[in-house]
């Protein structure tokens, strides 16, 4: 009877947990639909800004923001995008694994999301700055504020390189940790077929220096929004798997309970029959 009582408790607990994971799956699905529209609009905006900025870069020869042969990368600031909440599968762990595999002793962390703060504090890694005010209503104004801080760190020479590590959204079941260099900017060797269509005043370099804030805030906004949609997709998938596993566990426990109960009833009947036979004998 003790075993039956224990199995019944396990079944009840599994059902309760299943209700929670199913509810979390529904919430994540709703957030995914909401932010999915935002990421589509954001990707279009980011694409346009990139196109314009790349044109400026092609016409620029010298700038502290451009990579050249003299650049010596000794100290990198890693901007790590994590979530504020857990229960989202390997979303945070995969990003942090990519960071650690490239991290040097002199490097520091700019932690975005409370999970990043706790992860690197636990590893005794120096956090230069942090931002935990990141939810699905993350705004371009917030991205600009972060961008201004990063620009200050790089312009002052405090860091030789700034890299963002975030989760790139591919589809609802596929997302991968991605490393993106922000500074110094690599000037791609391309044929300048559109040179005659652009004129920069007073110079391309001056335009670059003035436009770099827009470039940086756009990257920050785009990567965080893309990370957020990946987070919700990862959480929905994790909770769906947890719910399905819970149902399977509940099914197996129910079978075990019924077998134990049947064995108990059979034993009781056997004892009654044996007792009756003894009395009759």
Swiss-Prot record:
Identification of the protein by name: ATP synthase gamma chain
Family (UniProt): Belongs to the ATPase gamma chain family.
Subunit and interaction comment: F-type ATPases have 2 components, CF(1) - the catalytic core - and CF(0) - the membrane proton channel. CF(1) has five subunits: alpha(3), beta(3), gamma(1), delta(1), epsilon(1). CF(0) has three main subunits: a, b and c.
One Gene Ontology term, aspect cellular component: proton-transporting ATP synthase complex
Function of the molecule: Produces ATP from ADP in the presence of a proton gradient across the membrane. The gamma chain is believed to be important in regulating ATPase activity and the flow of protons through the CF(0) complex.
PROSITE patterns reported for this sequence: ATPASE_GAMMA
InterPro entries reported for this sequence: ATP_synth_F1_ATPase_gsu (IPR035968), ATP_synth_F1_gsu (IPR000131), ATP_synth_F1_gsu_CS (IPR023632)
Pfam families: ATP-synt
Membrane topology summary: Peripheral membrane protein
GO biological process, one term: proton motive force-driven plasma membrane ATP synthesis
GO molecular function: ATP binding; proton-transporting ATP synthase activity, rotational mechanism
Organism name: Mesoplasma florum (strain ATCC 33453 / NBRC 100688 / NCTC 11704 / L1)
Record keywords, A-Z: ATP synthesis, Cell membrane, CF(1), Hydrogen ion transport, Ion transport, Membrane, Transport
Cellular localization per UniProt: Cell membrane
